[in-house]
Amino acid sequence: MESALPAAGFLYWVGAGTVAYLALRISYSLFTALRVWGVGNEAGVGPGLGEWAVVTGGTDGIGKSYAEELAKRGMKVVLISRSQDKLDQVSSEIKEKFKVETRTIAVDFTLEDIYDKIKTGLAGLEIGILVNNVGMSYEYPEYFLDVPDLDNVIKKMININILSVCKMTQLVLPGMVERSKGAILNISSGSGMFPVPLLTIYSATKTFVDFFSQCLHEEYRSKGIFVQSVLPYFVATKLAKIRKPTLDKPTPETFVKSAIKTVGLQSRTNGYLIHVLMGWIISNLPSWIYLKIAMNMNKATRVHYLKKIKKN
């Protein structure tokens, strides 16, 4: 009987310690959620980081919404995209609506010999924020060897989704380091958090963006540079082929308004509270269950797309 008492006391303290630990974890999570999603970092994102914001893929979707949000905060904006007509249109809209200076650089990010032109276009600008947004996905989910024009898709997707992030960072980061301030926002994807079969190349390139961002943040945070990996799930954009926004598929404007609050607070973010919850659920699933669900969903999307093409 006496020997059981110390054991009971030990178990009591183990239990009490576990409860206290869990209570602290929950309290910290709630505090962090309130700080990020309730208060945010509104004041920290703007001309205080530098006069200019540079946005790649800035004429549509998430990129355009970042450009507008940063212009709204008083930043001058450089838009970089492929179509000069679209660039002129969006540039004029931003200039007229937000009364800020804008510039445009027309390049095709599928090519590799564009960066001297971009370097010339950015020369002499005090760049406070770089948004590496330009991206490319599959036309539809497909098995790797059956992707139409596979050689070309591999080259284009690597150039757009990976090379552009590295080269744009190489161009802009030195000026930020020199001034000891700046932010680089790299738009990855929820597909970069976990493997997505039938979107294999896209998923892998977005994982690169996520890891590149995390590493770069650790390398340069002590120099005053904030690097963020943004990992959205579905947003109602042309790239995602979603026309009608819903609670879990927000408009680009809604997503960016939420995501920009996390700059300076989270170096890795889903950007939107519903997407955070989705990421938490997926991360707690056994990998075999998640992969089975992802595979079945994309197989169904593939079949639907191919049937539609066949009808047309």
Curated annotation (Swiss-Prot):
InterPro entries reported for this sequence: NAD(P)-bd_dom_sf, Sc_DH/Rdtase_CS, SDR_fam, VLCFA-Steroid_DH
Its EC number(s): 1.1.1.330, 1.1.1.62
Subcellular localization: Endoplasmic reticulum membrane
GO biological process terms on file: estrogen biosynthetic process; fatty acid biosynthetic process
GO molecular function, one term: very-long-chain 3-oxoacyl-CoA reductase activity
Keyword tags: Endoplasmic reticulum, Lipid biosynthesis, Lipid metabolism, Membrane, NADP, Oxidoreductase, Steroid biosynthesis, Transmembrane, Transmembrane helix
Segments passing through the bilayer: 4-24, 182-202, 271-291
Highest taxon listed in the record's lineage: Eukaryota
Active site residues according to the UniProt entry: Y202 (proton acceptor)
Pfam annotation, one family: adh_short
Gene3D superfamilies noted in UniProt: NAD(P)-binding Rossmann-like Domain (3.40.50.720)
Residue positions binding NADP(+): 50-79
Main function: Catalyzes the second of the four reactions of the long-chain fatty acids elongation cycle. This endoplasmic reticulum-bound enzymatic process, allows the addition of two carbons to the chain of long- and very long-chain fatty acids/VLCFAs per cycle. This enzyme has a 3-ketoacyl-CoA reductase activity, reducing 3-ketoacyl-CoA to 3-hydroxyacyl-CoA, within each cycle of fatty acid elongation. Thereby, it may participate in the production of VLCFAs of different chain lengths that are involved in multiple biological processes as precursors of membrane lipids and lipid mediators.
Family designation: Belongs to the short-chain dehydrogenases/reductases (SDR) family. 17-beta-HSD 3 subfamily.
Domain comment (free text): The di-lysine motif confers endoplasmic reticulum localization for type I membrane proteins.
Protein name (Swiss-Prot/TrEMBL): Very-long-chain 3-oxoacyl-CoA reductase
Organism field: Macaca fascicularis
